[in-house]
Curated annotation (Swiss-Prot):
Entry's family note: Belongs to the RbfA family.
Species for this entry: Vibrio atlanticus (strain LGP32) (Vibrio splendidus (strain Mel32))
Protein name: Ribosome-binding factor A
One Gene Ontology cellular component annotation held by this UniProt entry: cytosol
Gene for this chain: rbfA
Subcellular compartments: Cytoplasm
Xref: Gene3D superfamilies: 3.30.300.20
Top-rank taxon, per record: Bacteria
Major site of localization recorded for this protein: cytoplasm
UniProt entry keywords in alphabetical sequence: Cytoplasm, Ribosome biogenesis
Amino acid sequence: MSKEFSRTQRVSQQLQKELALILQREVRDSRIGMVTISDVEVSRDLAYAKVFVTFLCIGEQTPESCLAALKEHEVPVRMALGKRIRHRLTPEVRFTYDNTLVEGMRMSNLVSEVLNDDKRKQEESGRTDETQSKGEE
């Protein structure tokens, strides 16, 4: 049995593909850098699309400066999107920075740091996992 997707999910996937092509081929702005669309959330009435993006920033670029430059292109991107998709209403596009990758890396680093601190403290006290398991037997 195949999975059923709602109309908003199908439209969201289509918008993600089309927006990626538009940003790659039609938006020419050196301030933006390399953009990846990680997700698109569409409102139930298909009037609004919240586009989550990440950036590969080069040099002095920051995600905030890239996002500000990208937001200047919201109207032209919506117009290009309207030419590509066959919907009665072209959704209003809102770009939002997706920090889940950055937060995930930060959390991973924190966990690694805690594990390394714990290992260092065990070595300083003269106990390791092997000596603990031998003492328990």
